[in-house]
């Protein structure tokens, strides 16, 4: 066979499949990810990329580490968005209490998403 069938589920990478399903679900259930204002948060030549999406009082931070190494980053935080941020991807529930700066460690080849949950 010249091309393998993408419909053959035995050939799927289950980890990627699960991640894509989770990201699709997040986008469908979070209006801020559909219509929120886009603002770049960080772009580095070394492979870090991030942005925020804001809609009324909702805000999400999306960060990607495209490098092969753990990356540390320190982001300034707007006064109105200081307080509690909760991870929503790749796992849900971890809460960070954020002040003037947010110091983060991003695993290699990983994307992470946080949701502002108030003060």
Which role does the model predict for each range below?
Residues 1-119:
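Carbohydrate-interacting/catalytic domains
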